[in-house]
Amino acid sequence: MPKANNAVASRARRKRILKKAKGFWGSRGNILTVVKHAVDKAEQYAYRDRRAKKRTFRSLWIMRINAAARLNGTTYSRLVDAMSKKSVEIDRKVLAEIAVKDPAAFTQIVKSVID
């Protein structure tokens, strides 16, 4: 009796891996053994950078808040300290958005927090 192979599942598995490598350059996009390594590495980078993105955006928000705070005669650290003492709970993302989109409102926040 001939050996039955599971060609449908094998083809589906290969297609799934090749689909993830769509747009990869050269043999990294069409030779299965190379594609497997390339896709594995791409997924490692994606995992790492999803976490790094959070740090990057937080530092961007802090830079924006600091720049806007300095225009209002204070610094980021003094502003955040004063906000915590007055128990004003606006997170950095929203505060940076206010600083960029509505500088007048940001100035009001700074004046209300810093006496």
From Swiss-Prot:
CDD domains the UniProt entry points to: Ribosomal_L20
UniProt keywords, alphabetically: Ribonucleoprotein, Ribosomal protein, RNA-binding, rRNA-binding
Single annotated GO MF: rRNA binding
Cellular compartments per GO CC: ribonucleoprotein complex; ribosome
Coiled-coil residue spans: none
Keyword match Protein transport: no
One protein family per Pfam: Ribosomal_L20
Gene Ontology BP terms: ribosomal large subunit assembly; translation
Domain of life from the UniProt record: Bacteria
InterPro entries per record: Ribosomal_bL20, RIBOSOMAL_L20_CS, Ribosomal_protein_bL20_C
Annotated function: Binds directly to 23S ribosomal RNA and is necessary for the in vitro assembly process of the 50S ribosomal subunit. It is not involved in the protein synthesizing functions of that subunit.
Assigned protein family: Belongs to the bacterial ribosomal protein bL20 family.
Protein's name in the database: Large ribosomal subunit protein bL20
Organism per entry: Chlorobium limicola (strain DSM 245 / NBRC 103803 / 6330)
Gene responsible for this protein: rplT
